[in-house]
């Protein structure tokens, strides 16, 4: 196909090269000028001929014989000019035909040119996209290489940190064991001394108790020895004070033992934490506070977005429920209107309808006929119907616009949810980096001047890659504060966007409610207008105009709607005129066309029936052809 198209293009180009198109245009211009001149001369000649023929007809027969030759010459010259015009036109036509008659149609060539231009544009766009993709691929490859290098360095630093941590843990274990053994020895010596003192004090207490008993016995026997008793009582008081002092010393020793035990426990559990410096503790506290702030902000953003989504969903559900309820009410009212019928009321309304009359707007038109009033009423109803149709169209357009706005707002909400998820992922990555920083601070404290710590490599990168030096503690704090500021700005932006979205959704919901109420009013007015139009048409056909006026027409119209009764009457009259077969068909059609589901099922049944008939006819035709084939042979 490509070879054939190239051959056609070559033929077209060669034929249009050999066609002398510019020369043909020039010749055509010259021929057009000559034709215009000939047309002018021919018009002048015709005018002369017409004038002379009129004069010739007016002259008598004797003069006509003398002027006949002049007229014949004029006619001959006119015929010669016409022949010249025809010959010149034929010559120009044949020249154009000879040059362009065999030339093929240039339309495919133009299409090919347009397609070529389109393909060239597409190729240029694809080239640009290719260059952009190549640039992005190169950037991604560079990033992957950098990530691989960083991972390798991280693995190296992890291995070094683990080895140094193991060494330091072994050293601290040995030191703790030594200190613990020394303290145990001290505690044992102290316990032995305390036990000996306690034994001495208990023995003294027993001796004092025995001496006090003896003293009591002697006091009961010898009342005269008062001075000795006083001396002994003083001694007893001194011994008791010594006992109190000994008890206090015992309590103090027990408290010191408990404190020493707690210190040993703290030394066992916190031997590895003694090496942490105050700066590292400050950094740990800063990272903990930063993580807590970020987590609280994230939770607040999540709760706000969740509440907003819940409000949106609730509003949408309420609107859907209201629409469903309105549809149900409408269907119920339609069913009731179709089913409701009462013979007595219809009979009474028929008797009144024969004499009913539309009340005029002015009191001066009381003597006018009913037909003129009906015509006026018809004009008013037609104008109202046109206005209501225009308002209905405007309301439907507004509803479509509001639905589009609601869908656009839902899309915005989904986009914000995706952005929040990305933020959560970024915060999780920040938490992971903080944990890595906390676990590797021991290595950073004793690192050499020529090596990077793991935290500095994570926060700032490799100096060979980014042409920078080892980051200090201030750089870590600055990066953390920058991350917090960025996240706060994003949070404020999302809150503002959420507030605007909530306001827009509430405004859209209010507009939708107003439009739905207006639509319901328009539908009601449309039904009333339709009933009035039907009643007017029937009244003009079946009732002759009369001058009788009924005074109770206005009161009756206020109490009873004659249009609904007329519609029922008309339906019953048409149904009574039907035959049995027509009634069956009418009932079937009414059941089939009652709802969308029945209509769809009936339509599908018709399609399947037609397809079945087509298949049967095709099979019969094929069978007939196969039956007639041996007869032909």
Curated annotation (Swiss-Prot):
The gene is coy1. It is a single-pass type IV membrane protein. It is found in: Golgi apparatus membrane. May be involved in intra-Golgi transport. The lineage of its organism: Eukaryota, Fungi, Dikarya, Ascomycota, Taphrinomycotina. Residues 623-633 are lumenal. This is Protein CASP. One of its GO terms (biological process) is intra-Golgi vesicle-mediated transport. It comes from the Eukaryota. GO terms for cellular component: Golgi membrane. It comes from Schizosaccharomyces pombe (strain 972 / ATCC 24843). Keywords: Coiled coil, Golgi apparatus, Membrane, Transmembrane, Transmembrane helix, Transport. Belongs to the CASP family.
């Amino acid at each position: 196909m490509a070879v054939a198209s190239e051959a056609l293009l070559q033929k077209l180009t060669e034929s249009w090269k050999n066609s002398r198109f510019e020369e043909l245009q020039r010749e055509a211009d010259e021929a057009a000028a000559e034709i215009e001149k000939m047309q002018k001369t021919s018009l002048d000649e015709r005018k002369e001929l017409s004038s002379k023929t009129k004069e010739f007809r007016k002259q008598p027969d004797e003069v006509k014989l003398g002027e006949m030759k002049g007229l014949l010459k004029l006619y001959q010259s006119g015929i010669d000019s016409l022949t010249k015009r025809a010959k010149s036109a034929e010559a120009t036509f044949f020249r154009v035909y000879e040059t362009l008659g065999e030339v093929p149609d240039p339309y495919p060539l133009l299409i090919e040119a347009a397609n070529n231009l389109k393909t060239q544009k597409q190729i240029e766009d694809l080239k640009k996209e290719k260059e952009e993709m190549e640039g992005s691929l190169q950037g991604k490859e560079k990033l992957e290489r950098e990530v691989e290098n960083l991972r390798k360095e991280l693995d190296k630093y992890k291995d070094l940190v683990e080895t140094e941590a193991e060494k330091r843990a072994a050293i601290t274990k040995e030191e703790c064991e030594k200190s613990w053994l020394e303290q145990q020895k001290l505690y044992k010596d102290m316990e032995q001394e305390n036990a000996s003192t306690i034994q001495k004090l208990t023995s003294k207490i027993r001796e004092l108790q025995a001496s006090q008993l003896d003293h009591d016995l002697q006091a009961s026997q010898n009342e005269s020895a008062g001075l000795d008793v006083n001396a002994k009582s003083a001694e007893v008081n001194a011994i008791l004070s010594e006992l109190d002092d000994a008890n206090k010393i015992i309590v103090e020793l027990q408290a010191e033992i408990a404190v020493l035990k707690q210190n040993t426990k703290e030394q066992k559990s916190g031997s590895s934490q003694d090496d942490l410096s105050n700066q590292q503790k400050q950094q740990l506290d800063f990272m903990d506070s930063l993580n807590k702030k970020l987590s609280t902000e994230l939770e607040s953003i999540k709760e706000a977005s969740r509440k907003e989504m819940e409000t949106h969903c609730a509003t949408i559900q309420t609107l859907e429920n209201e629409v469903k309820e309105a549809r149900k009410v409408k269907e119920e009212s339609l069913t009731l209107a179709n089913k409701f019928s009462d013979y007595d009321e219809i009979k009474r309304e028929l008797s009144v309808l024969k004499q009913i009359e539309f009340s005029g707007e002015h009191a001066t038109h009381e003597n006018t006929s009913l037909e003129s009033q009906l015509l006026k009423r018809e004009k008013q109803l037609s104008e109202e119907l046109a206005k209501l149709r225009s308002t209905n169209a405007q309301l439907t357009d507004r509803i479509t616009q509001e639905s589009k706005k609601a869908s656009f707002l839902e899309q915005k909400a989904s986009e914000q949810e995706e952005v929040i998820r990305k933020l959560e992922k970024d915060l999780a990555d920040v938490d992971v980096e903080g944990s890595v920083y906390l676990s590797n601070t021991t290595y950073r404290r004793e690192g050499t001047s020529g090596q990077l710590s793991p935290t500095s490599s994570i926060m700032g990168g490799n100096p060979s890659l980014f042409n920078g030096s080892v980051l200090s503690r201030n750089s870590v704090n600055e990066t953390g504060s920058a991350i917090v500021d960025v996240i706060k700005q994003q949070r404020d932006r999302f809150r503002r966007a959420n507030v605007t979205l909530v306001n827009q959704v509430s405004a859209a919901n209010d507009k939708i409610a107003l439009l739905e109420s207006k639509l319901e009013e328009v539908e009601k007015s449309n039904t009333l207008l339709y009933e009035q139009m039907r009643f007017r048409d029937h009244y003009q056909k079946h009732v002759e105009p009369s001058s009788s006026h009924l005074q109770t027409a206005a009161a009756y119209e206020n109490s009873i709607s004659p249009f609904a009764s007329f519609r029922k009457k008309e339906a019953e009259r048409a149904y009574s005129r039907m035959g049995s077969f027509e009634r069956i068909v009418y009932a079937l059609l009414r059941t089939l066309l009652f709802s969308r589901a029945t209509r769809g099922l009936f339509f599908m049944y018709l399609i399947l029936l037609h397809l079945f008939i087509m298949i049967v006819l095709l099979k019969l035709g094929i069978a007939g052809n196969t039956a007639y084939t041996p007869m032909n042979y």
